[in-house]
Design a protein with these regions (language model features):
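Terminal helix/beta-alpha structural elements that buttress the NAD(P)+-binding lobe
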Residues: 1-25, 32-64, 69-70, 75-346
Length: 346
């Protein structure tokens, strides 16, 4: 089958047609890749080799498609079902930059009728990362409820990116008023996702804190840094400005590489979506248990339209080779819209 191969860390992506089609194992499904999205993690893995389990490797982790074969023990899916989600990163057979890929049954989403195949490809990695940060890390209950003027705030740093937009949506869905940070040019993206207010992340930290204080009046105890660059702002906001009567204040971040100094009364959580589908460590087992437990509710909210796909830009025509164009375009992409590629018509 065709795919986009990477021979080594620091190498170039190239199109091949000699890949072996994967075979689903127990509790796995084989999916025909119809649309795949481009994420920052592909460039990270290409440059560093991290998260890659074997070379050469096909990358890509975010896609939508059609089930063409089910492995032993699968009960959720049947051949012909439309599915999407985030696959196991850096693992042969599971990558989405190829014609067919594997998914673990309990980590895959059923596509709602009201979501297009292109839209579905924008959801998996961003929504799951946001859910790990907001629901698991910041301990927000995954339950649909209306907010009021008395509701506490959830602060989302880096709210205009794909993870940030889903974090904003989750916060609003779960009854929080949401304050998001972004560049001023992306304020409308943040508000369209559901944020009640936004502020400029380019301000110096003290000015960001003053803005947070003015908007929230200290009625918050949870901050999620979707940008991986907001640790100082988030922690200082919680220590200096947050509701001091809260027994615990929560800071979660997508920065999973820089240690965070423990502070009294502050719970911290570093999101590691790179562990999706992996096994062998207590951490990986817990992360996958968390993801699997959230997917049914997330599916329900997507079906009801309470969570929405991201806006997207489709790159190129139809075909696996178009992924090369999208990877190149991603290097200069700043619009806040997801880049997607259609590999096949159906």
């Amino acid at each position: 089958m065709k795919g986009i191969l990477l021979d080594n860390a620091g190498g170039d992506f190239h199109l091949v047609d000699t890949l072996e089609e994967p075979t689903p194992g127990r509790n796995q499904i084989l999916v025909k890749s119809l649309v795949t999205a481009i994420n920052p993690v592909e460039g990270f893995m290409q440059g560093t080799g991290q998260l890659v389990t074997a070379w050469p490797i096909v990358l890509g982790c975010d896609a939508s498609g059609t089930v063409v074969e089910v492995g032993e023990g699968v009960t959720k899916f049947n051949n012909g079902d439309a599915v999407f989600g985030c696959t196991v990163l850096g693992t042969p057979g599971h990558s989405t930059f190829q014609e067919y890929f594997l998914m673990n049954e309990n980590l895959a989403f059923k596509k709602p009728e009201g979501v297009t195949t292109e839209q579905a490809a924008t959801i998996g990695a961003g929504l799951l990362t946001a859910a790990l940060g907001v629901i698991i890390g910041a301990k927000v209950e995954l339950k649909s409820q209306e907010s009021t003027t008395e509701s506490p705030w959830l602060i989302v740093l880096g709210a205009a990116g794909s993870v940030g937009q889903f974090a904003v949506q989750l916060g609003k869905l779960c009854g929080y008023r949401v304050l998001g940070s972004s560049s001023p040019s992306n304020t409308e993206i943040v508000k369209a996702a559901g944020a009640e207010a936004a502020f400029d992340y380019k301000l110096i930290v003290n000015e960001q804190l003053a803005t947070i204080k003015q908007i929230t009046n200290g009625n918050f105890s949870r901050v999620f840094d979707a940008s991986a660059m907001g640790t100082e702002t988030g922690i200082e906001a919680l220590l200096q400005l947050a509701d001091q009567s809260a027994p615990v204040r929560y800071f979660s971040t997508t920065n999973d590489w820089a240690p965070i100094e423990p502070r009294d009364g502050l719970a911290t959580h570093q999101v590691e979506l790179g562990q999706i589908g992996r096994s062998g460590t207590e951490k990986a087992e817990q992360i996958n248990k968390d993801i699997a437990s959230m997917i049914p509710k997330l599916e329900e909210y997507l079906e009801a339209g309470l969570l929405r796909p991201l806006e997207y830009v489709q790159v190129g025509d139809v075909g696996v080779g178009e992924i090369l164009k999208a990877l190149e375009a991603f290097n200069n992409h700043r619009s806040g819209k997801k880049l997607v590629v259609r590999l096949a018509e159906n």
